[in-house]
Amino acid sequence: TAPVVARAIKRDIEERLPQNLGALASIGQTFRSLAEALPFGRIRRDFWSRFYFSKGPAAYDAEGVAGAKRVLHELLAEFKSASPKPGHVDFVGAGPGDPTLLTHRARVLLHEADVILHDRLVDRRILELARREATLIEVGKTGFGQAMAQDDIHHLIVEHVARGAQVLRLKSGDPTVFGRLDEELEAIAAQDISYSIVPGITAASAAAAAVGRSLTRRGRNAQLRLITGHDMAGYAEQEWRALAKPGAVAAIYMGKKAARFIQGRLLMHGADPLTPVSIIENSSRPEQVIRAAALNALTEALQDMAGPAVLLYGISPQSAAEHVFQPREADLCR
């Protein structure tokens, strides 16, 4: 069946493309140096699209090579004299890592973007979906480590949009969850820049799917908290008394380095030391690791984990028995 399918695909592609596309490509190749007078990005892409799929085929059919070259010069003059299109920025969620979990809209915008400003945690396989000509700039942050200043990220967005670029601000997970989206929106609002927001699968959802559990369950928790392990001031304070109650569930982002602080606060406020915690490192990626620990063994369970992780407090994996970390006697005596 494979040859039949291949022939069908080949026939479908040939029917969609202009019959004279090969000749037009040869003519266009000789014109590329002149076309470089147009700004890089959308304007230049629109120029070539108009030639190959609109004006060029008709001119070539009517007048041959001379007609195609005439249209190229006419289009170049038209695009050079046209008012430049304003730039635009799309804030897009890259999801937890697996490229197949990207939304369709995210894939489309990845292919259209001129400049991609991406978080450090965005999977390389996702970045490979961008156009070859696109400019990729890592603007990542590392917890308690080196990071690009947020003001510098704002400047990069505004700078590239001012040049007429279609900018993709690609954020790991969902841009509205611990992604400092509001700050970037405020920066572009001051410049009257148009934008869109494309949601992605947040790490908590991917982590819950990985351990085979629901984030909410009747009779267990009527609330779900998404909390961060640290904020701009350091370790983040939470409503510890509420979190320490039986049945409380929270997805903890950026919690590895703050694990001992979180553990101490919860135990101090009366949390059951045996409260389950699921640890999902590199969620949805080939190197994904799932561990289960009781709250009193949390820091020990995290000791050799180097990748990004989400902690699901109050939730244990479906098959956790062989993965549960038990605290040492020294830990119990602290």
Predicted feature locations:
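Adenine nucleotide-associated cytosolic modules
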Residues: 1-15, 33, 66, 123-125, ...
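Class I SAM-dependent methyltransferase SAM-binding "motif I" and its flanking Rossmann-like core
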Residues: 174-246, 289-293, 300, 334
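A contiguous loop/helix-start segment that scaffolds small-molecule binding in enzyme catalytic cores
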Residues: 26-89, 152, 162-167, 223, ...
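Short, solvent-exposed amphipathic alpha-helical segments in soluble enzyme
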Residues: 10-14, 104-112, 130-135, 183-187, ...
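Short alpha-helices
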Residues: 1-21, 202-206, 212, 309
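Flexible loop/N-cap segments at domain edges
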Residues: 91-92, 97-99
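Class I S-adenosyl-L-methionine
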Residues: 78, 85-91, 111-201, 206, ...
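Short, acidic/turn-prone active-site loops that include or flank metal/cofactor-
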Residues: 1, 97, 121-123, 139-147, ...
